[in-house]
Amino acid sequence: LDVYSKVKGKIPFFNRKIESWYQNASEFKMYNLDDLANLEHTENFTEKSLSHIFEGDLNKKGRAGGYHYDMIEGTSGSIIEGTKSPALNDAGIYEAKVEVNGIPKKANGGKSTFFPDHMSPQEIVDAINEAYSNMELIEGSRYSGTSQNGIDIEIILNSEGKIITAYPQKIE
């Protein structure tokens, strides 16, 4: 009789952790912070926007924000376990509750939308640039554009027209 059969039908904590790891692990390549340092075609982005998008950050008030890609190791942002949604559309966009440096995001119900795991950081920068090239004003400094692979991306610009943040929209 194994040890786990005595747990009254519950998945033991150890097995839950492994099961969770398998759900989050994918067949897609993981990247690291060095890969972010080597991104090309970033002229349309502010200095801080790429870390906001790819790593998550804390604003001046200490509030968590950003984090729209989960395939880079060593970032300050992370998905809160058990909150990752199934794909919201054919492109592979999903959403999840996030935290940055252990501080849960509060804006947007604590959720971020995520670029598909199968895309590389460079492919995401390129997709944002494609959306930037055909974006239309939503209101204020918020715009919406579409990448060549069909991802609708919301873009927020600063007063100089540089990208502060960009994230996939949940549109089907």
Each model region followed by its residue ranges:
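Hydrophobic/aromatic-lined pockets within catalytic cores
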Residues: 5, 58, 171
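N-terminal "domain-start" segment
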Residues: 15-145
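Hydrophobic, gly/ala-rich membrane-insertion helices/peptides used by toxins and envelope proteins
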Residues: 1-23
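Active-site or metal-binding loop neighborhoods of secreted/extracellular toxin and effector enzymes
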Residues: 130-172
